[in-house]
């Protein structure tokens, strides 16, 4: 078996949202959407959308399906928890640390105290049902440095990084470790959910729309895809892979987790997001702290753009879709007609690309419509989040622009509320659409302010440059 070959017994399952075209000659889906044509031999290996690796041919097909993002792994049991060391960076959060350690029974744990005012000591964990080692930084070096210190002391094949304000749910580790049956997987992340029920509107909003919660759909981690990164609040990594890329960048005060993900991908590793595994996070729910945190996240975009100029575009859109919506927003009869012409030409181009896959007119129409709608949602989000200072200026100067911005703000908020409400826990306290819409706009204003501040600080506009595809 080669170093990257999937092992026998490993299975993949075609995503339920992927469309099977014709008699199974092609698959349409993935993120971004693509058309994958299948040879007759490949079709014969798939059984109800599932493929089990038995030999070199099936292993190669499974890898193709995974890399095309049209299928997800169904691995056999993975490494043991004894192969994992948990690294916890902490600073001035003794209560959260105790809560976390209590949930880590039977695991080896390294606590890295990053210059706490009241230093963490080994005696603080008397009676804990895990093997704990405490390391100290005499003064704070930041979470990235604390994680690297823990990584340097780790002797196991795998390392789990958990922040001190999280608490894993039962079965989290086993659900993640299975993915490492794929020898190319370097990092797997769980879904981050809320630790406590909503005590105020901000808490209820965070339970539905936390920046750390990447949703309920499993996915590969790839730039410009559904899941473009995973937060380091909770991740499990292959120790050797993290060391090979130099660990976390200690010069970054925010966005170091995004940077690590992208450096691993650039090195040829594969990353997975596994929402079956749940880790609860103690969200900031006081309004001032919450706004400051959103701005802090926005401030990471510009430093990331300096390091990864091809991965930080706030808007990735086709030129045709962009032009169609610009013309539509003009609001004149001629503009709407031109927009319709562009939409028809887009449909014809899609039809030509799909002509070898036994597709119907409805298939082409569905793909074109979904593409234009996705582009509209991207534009609405970007107007309200990344480009809101420009949108505000345009709205002040132009009545027509004011109408466009208002429509974008409402559509973006309502659609996002509807989507996220579907994935909410049944016992979660609901948040109404109006409250959600207001907080979503505050969220975007804070993030955008941090983004623009970072752009000025770094003197780099890469985080604002859209990526327009032909």
From Swiss-Prot:
Membrane topology according to the record: Single-pass membrane protein
InterPro entries in alphabetical order: Glyco_trans_2-like, MftF, Nucleotide-diphossugar_trans
Gene3D superfamilies recorded: Spore Coat Polysaccharide Biosynthesis Protein SpsA, Chain A
Keywords from the named record: Cell membrane, Glycosyltransferase, Membrane, Transferase, Transmembrane, Transmembrane helix
Protein name: Pre-mycofactocin glycosyltransferase
Transmembrane segments: 315-335
Pfam family, one: Glycos_transf_2
Entry EC no(s): 2.4.1.-
Family assignment from sequence similarity: Belongs to the glycosyltransferase 2 family.
Record function comment: Involved in the biosynthesis of the enzyme cofactor mycofactocin (MFT). Acts as a glycosyltransferase that catalyzes the oligoglycosylation of pre-mycofactocin (PMFT), adding up to nine beta-1,4-linked glucose residues.
Source superkingdom: Bacteria
Molecular function GO terms recorded: glycosyltransferase activity
NCBIfam families, per the entry: mycofact_glyco
